[in-house]
């Protein structure tokens, strides 16, 4: 007699991203209480399981939801506000002045817009570092994605705190509010070496240990950052942070562009994870992170979009394409960054960066964080190697279904938890606010 389950999801092709990287033709997934109960051939699943709901995606490819290992979701409101500038000019001359006027309502609005974009392009979980992260998590709670959120901690006031001394209590309070949430988690997020002091970084380390939280930090993003760190602290960013005890297996470092071979060895030895953000690094001309060298040392890399103000999208499919092509031409080696490795970064690697067990793969016992892509799209046919299509052909807009914890959040153009038209009306109002902030900063 068939076993009961909540949902049976069927499709022409399933890319599991399990340890064997199994691909199943004419497959199905049994989902119960938010987790995958079984995955296999359609006939076997339908014969062994009885679903209350059956969703037949037909000529679609089912795969794990993508994981954005580093972003600033609310910066969707600043998309296109300032472009074609070096990182520090972009930050200090344009972004920071506008961010001074942020409110919780604006952060929540921008984060919800970011969630909508991610759901529309197949992302089910993301690691966020920004301001007023309680507001980001309210948007996450509304939209239904998973999120590891870190309040950016600076050596100066932010819209979330007037005194940096209070930032640590703020993070404690955020942790207390969200620690039992099924899809949200907290990280300790010192913004960067150049916006912190040794004392603040040490307190971030201690707070992470106290609360059992991971650390999320921008590091070694540019040569300018390195030069400044040497001038102020007498060391390059990686050894400087290592001396402060920040580099552990619970640490995810965003960017890691300006690294020496010895620093790559040190990061590998410490077991840190790196969030590689190729499109943002290219757009800001920050450089090319030595991703292939890090992978060669056995390091785990996730893939991140960075914020929509420096990318300018949160689309993980286009990020995969850029990642693969960038490293091939950089090394003049077409075997660099193969599709399978890049797909791993966007799924399993991202799951590792978020410290969320079981996401980024489709296998029994794992959370049912699943997306389905339309194989009827002209750019998706004919299909020989699914990983190749996902990295080199898919654009993200083939996404038909996005599911988190067995719950359908997006299906064929419709969001199930919020009204997109209402959201866009509020976003248009926020554009007016942003332009006023720009004029006031001049």
Curated annotation (Swiss-Prot):
EC primary class: hydrolase
Superkingdom field: Bacteria
Reactions it catalyzes: S-adenosyl-L-homocysteine + H2O + H(+) = S-inosyl-L-homocysteine + NH4(+); S-methyl-5'-thioadenosine + H2O + H(+) = S-methyl-5'-thioinosine + NH4(+)
Binding site for Zn(2+): 70, 72, 218, 306
EC id: 3.5.4.28, 3.5.4.31
Keyword annotations: Hydrolase, Metal-binding, Zinc
SUPFAM superfamilies named among the record's database cross-references: Composite domain of metallo-dependent hydrolases, Metallo-dependent hydrolases
UniProt signal peptide: none
Residue sites binding substrate per the record: 99, 191, 221, 306
Cofactor(s) required for function per UniProt: Zn(2+)
GO molecular function: 5'-deoxyadenosine deaminase activity; 5'-methylthioadenosine deaminase activity; metal ion binding; S-adenosylhomocysteine deaminase activity
Cofactor: record remark: Binds 1 zinc ion per subunit.
Record InterPro entries: Amidohydro-rel (IPR006680), Deaminase_MtaD/DadD (IPR023512), Metal-dep_hydrolase_composite (IPR011059), Metal_Hydrolase (IPR032466), MTA/SAH_deaminase (IPR050287)
Family: Belongs to the metallo-dependent hydrolases superfamily. MTA/SAH deaminase family.
Function: Catalyzes the deamination of 5-methylthioadenosine and S-adenosyl-L-homocysteine into 5-methylthioinosine and S-inosyl-L-homocysteine, respectively. Is also able to deaminate adenosine.
Protein name, entry field: 5-methylthioadenosine/S-adenosylhomocysteine deaminase
Species this protein is from: Nitratidesulfovibrio vulgaris (strain ATCC 29579 / DSM 644 / CCUG 34227 / NCIMB 8303 / VKM B-1760 / Hildenborough) (Desulfovibrio vulgaris)
Upper taxonomic lineage: Bacteria, Pseudomonadati, Thermodesulfobacteriota, Desulfovibrionia, Desulfovibrionales
């Amino acid at each position: 007699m068939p076993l009961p389950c909540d949902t049976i999801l069927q499709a022409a092709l399933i890319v599991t991203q399990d340890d064997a990287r199994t691909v199943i033709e004419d497959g199905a997934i049994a989902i119960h209480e938010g987790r995958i109960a079984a995955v296999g051939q359609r006939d076997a699943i339908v014969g062994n399981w009885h679903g209350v709901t059956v969703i037949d995606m037909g000529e679609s490819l089912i795969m794990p939801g993508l994981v954005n290992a580093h972003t600033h979701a609310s910066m969707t409101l600043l998309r296109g506000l300032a472009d074609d500038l070096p990182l520090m000019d972009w930050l200090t001359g344009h972004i920071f002045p506008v961010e001074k006027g942020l409110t919780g309502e604006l952060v929540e609005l921008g984060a919800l817009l970011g969630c909508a974009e991610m759901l529309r392009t197949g992302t089910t979980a993301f690691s966020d570092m920004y301001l007023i992260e309680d507001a980001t998590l309210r948007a996450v709670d509304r939209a239904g994605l998973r999120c590891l959120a870190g309040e950016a901690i600076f050596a100066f006031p932010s819209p979330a705190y007037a005194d940096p001394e209070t930032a640590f209590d703020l993070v404690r309070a955020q942790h207390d509010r969200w620690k039992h949430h099924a899809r949200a988690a907290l990280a300790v997020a010192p913004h960067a070496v150049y916006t912190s002091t040794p004392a603040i970084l040490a307190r971030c380390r201690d707070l992470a240990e106290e609360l059992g939280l991971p650390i999320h930090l921008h590091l070694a993003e540019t040569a300018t950052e390195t030069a400044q760190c040497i001038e102020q602290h007498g060391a390059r960013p990686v050894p400087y942070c290592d001396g402060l005890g920040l580099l552990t297996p619970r640490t995810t470092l965003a960017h890691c562009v300006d690294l020496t071979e010895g620093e790559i060895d040190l990061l590998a030895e410490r077991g840190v994870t790196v969030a590689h953000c190729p499109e943002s690094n290219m757009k800001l001309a920050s450089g090319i992170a030595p991703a292939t060298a890090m992978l060669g040392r056995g390091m785990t890399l996730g893939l991140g979009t960075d914020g929509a103000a420096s990318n300018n999208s949160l689309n993980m499919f286009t990020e995969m394409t850029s990642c693969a092509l960038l490293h091939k031409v950089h090394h003049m080696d077409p075997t660099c960054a193969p599709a399978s490795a890049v797909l791993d970064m966007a799924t399993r690697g991202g799951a590792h960066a978020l410290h969320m067990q079981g996401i980024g793969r489709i296998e029994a016992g794992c959370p049912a964080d699943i997306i389905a892509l339309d194989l009827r799209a002209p750019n998706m046919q004919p299909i020989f190697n699914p990983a190749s299509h996902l990295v080199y052909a898919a654009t993200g807009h083939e996404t038909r279904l996005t599911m988190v914890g067995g719950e359908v959040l997006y299906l064929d153009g419709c969001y199930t938890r919020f009204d997109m038209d209402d959201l866009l009306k509020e976003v248009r109002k926020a554009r007016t606010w942003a332009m006023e902030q720009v004029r006031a900063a001049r």
